[in-house]
Amino acid sequence: MDLTNPVISLCMKGSRAEFEGRQEDARNLYWQAWELAKDDYDACIAAHYVARFQIEPEDIFRWNQAALTHADKVQEDSAKEFYPSLYLNMGRSYELLGNHTEAKRFYDLAARLGFEHQAE
């Protein structure tokens, strides 16, 4: 991961703000990252973080789906490391929407990559 990439830098700052309890700062930093995204790799990362601050299940789904769609368009392997998290988030999105069949499918995809879903 290129830590000099401005989108990644903004998302890291957003994560730091989020973990420090500065939710509004985190939200703003993630939106800045989304607005700054120049390619599918950047958009994948930014959408992944923007999804975290959505309230409605449909919006959570839409942003998680955008992250996965952008990851699928990245030509090189740079987005490969994000797939387990993207699949888990898609599983959770489908779960929130009541589509347990699709949720399980995405949880299974994540599990094949070595990440198990932990029920809440």
Task: Report residues per predicted region.
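TPR repeat positional signature
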Residues: L10, C44-A47, Y87
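Conserved small-residue packing positions in alpha-helical repeats and bundles
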Residues: G14, H48-A51, P84, G91
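Flexible helix-coil transition and linker loops at the boundaries of alpha-helical arrays
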Residues: M1, A33-D40, A71-K80, E116-H117
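Alpha-helical segment of the N-proximal tetratricopeptide repeat
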Residues: I8-D25
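Helix-adjacent hinge/juxtasegments
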Residues: C44-K80
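TPR/TPR-like (Sel1-like) alpha-helical repeat modules
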Residues: R62-D72, L96-Q118
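TPR-repeat structural position
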Residues: Q23-E24, P57-I60, H100
